[in-house]
Amino acid sequence: MSDINIKIGLAEMLKGGVIMDVVNAEQAEIAQQAGAVAVMALERVPADIRKDGGIARMSDPKLIKEIMSVVSIPVMAKARIGHFVEAQILESLGVDFIDESEVLTPADELNHIDKDSFKVPFVCGCTNLGEALRRIGEGAALIRTKGEAGTGNIVEAVRQLRQVNKDINYIKNADKSELMAIAKNLQAPYDLVTYVHKNGKLPVPNFSAGGVATPADAALMMQLGAESVFVGSGIFKSADPFKRARAIVSAVTYYNDAKILAEVSEDLGEPMTGINCDFEKFSQRGW
């Protein structure tokens, strides 16, 4: 089995679950108790990165090690787009996945990280199919929508997942003779376009992130075809993080059962304060 197949296999194990952003060991323990399949270790959730401004970088290795020491579930951490040295440091710490993330300030405006040169699997964001296939071509083992992290607004994640699905359906139904032109237009590797044509799906798991704040948001993304959900600011910026985290985990498990969704949505306290997406968009970082 090739390295990429092993990496994809690790990503497949996260399907049907919730990955939660945490900023300290206490939050990591809450996330694990609530049923998270993995945690994302970072110093500031996206809502605070937006509010504080400045340059957002890889988290302090000490924080990441503290979080890794208190949970048994996989731990992810973020590196800046193109910052392969941050990725080397994260790999040396033993994190389970690296997210080459638009939430952090990009280090390279032209080049993403060569993910094939690492043993640790990478997560990457996308806004459309061409972007997804370019990241997979670089070695990403897991794709997620970018959405608009830190907003509590699901609209961009919905738009992006629908666009990816629309693009996949178009390629699936295209004539084989059209695939090279499609690859050219998408700026995507031809072999990956032919994979989508034959299989009607991405060659790696496709998750959703960016703006998920409620159980209904999580279920919406699952019904639209996401295979798992990342939740950032939506849990620990709410009034009752544990209860909301449990509810979102249940919503991902029972995303097609409206009665259960209604039950788990009751009495969760105030959600995070949402903001509109008509400012600098993190999703426009990277290409």
Swiss-Prot record:
GO terms for biological process: amino acid metabolic process; pyridoxal phosphate biosynthetic process; pyridoxine biosynthetic process. Keywords: Lyase, Pyridoxal phosphate, Schiff base. D-ribose 5-phosphate binds at residues 21, 150, 211, 232-233. Pathway: Cofactor biosynthesis; pyridoxal 5'-phosphate biosynthesis. It comes from the Bacteria. InterPro entries: Aldolase_TIM, PdxS/SNZ, PdxS/SNZ_N, RibuloseP-bd_barrel. Its EC number is 4.3.3.6. The active site is at 78 (schiff-base intermediate with d-ribose 5-phosphate). Belongs to the PdxS/SNZ family. PANTHER family: PYRIDOXAL 5'-PHOSPHATE SYNTHASE SUBUNIT SNZ1-RELATED. This is Pyridoxal 5'-phosphate synthase subunit PdxS. It comes from Francisella tularensis subsp. mediasiatica (strain FSC147). The gene is pdxS.
